[in-house]
Amino acid sequence: SRGLGDVYKRQALARPQHVEDKTFRTVNGIDIMIAFDLSYSMETPDMVLNRMPINRLVAAKHVITQFVDSRPDDRIGIVGFAGKTKSFCPLTLDHALVNSIIRDFHPRMIQADGTAIGSAIAAAATRLDDRKNTKSKIIILVTDGASNSGQISPLVAAENAAKLGIKIYTIAVGTEEGTLANGMVVQSEFDEPTLRKIAQLTGGEHFRATNMASFNKAFTSIGKLEKSEAKVQTVRHIEEYFMYFLVTGAALALLGLSLQVLKPAPAP
């Protein structure tokens, strides 16, 4: 027992231990409100996907749902607008819900026709202003027309958003030539100077999406400009085992000593 006790003592002196590293990832996500044009002109079929003509709304759904999927750490919300504005989804990390809402979009969801860009910016900014502790807040405005409705002008709404620290990225969708829809040539009344000014006032950027390639490129560019901040921390946990060996060794040594003491003396 004493010999075995010495073995355990030597093991204790070697300081056996178990080392485990745990990595923790902390992400400071961005709050993103997407202002989605649902006016009737979004049904203009002047975009092409997989060699098939599609309308602007279908193109927007395709590109935006992909963008949502690419931002797992960001809270995303949706406002839709035509002649009026409607909030469809508050800021959420439930991106399956966001994309489900987007896929159900159609122009007749908002009965008032027109393009209320200022009201859409104001509604989106109100949602973002509720999030006081978020480091980065942005609005992505997707539209195919000039503002012709609403209670507030686009530039005033943009100035108010800028005061709240909100950046606005504007995307003009569609071709100036338009295309045939229901036997009629449909053209868009783009107001790109205003869209550029909205972006400029808030520190954002303006993009023009005349086809699927440029539409995708716009959202890719926004994704590169607006990155979530991730911090990775590694914590090392060390569990010492020497005490187990030391106690066991001491116990065995004591047992060996006790056995020697209790061992009967040899017969004379």
What does each model-found stretch correspond to?
Residues 2-8:
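Short, small-residue-biased leader/transition segments that mark boundaries at the very start
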Residues 12-27, 262-267:
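Aromatic-capped interface at the extracytoplasmic side
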Residues 22-29, 42-75, 92-99:
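…and closely analogous acidic/polar surface helices at protein-protein or active-site interfaces
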Residues 31-41, 75-80, 99-101, 138-142, ...:
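Soluble periplasmic/extracytoplasmic beta-strand elements of cell-envelope proteins
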Residues 36, 42-45, 84-118, 198-201:
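Short, charged loop segments at secondary-structure junctions
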Residues 72-105, 125-130, 179-196, 218-221:
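Short beta-strand-loop
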Residues 112-115, 137-138, 145-201, 219:
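VWA/integrin I-like adhesion module and closely mimicked acidic/polar interface patches used
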Residues 207-268:
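C-terminal "exit" segments of structured domains
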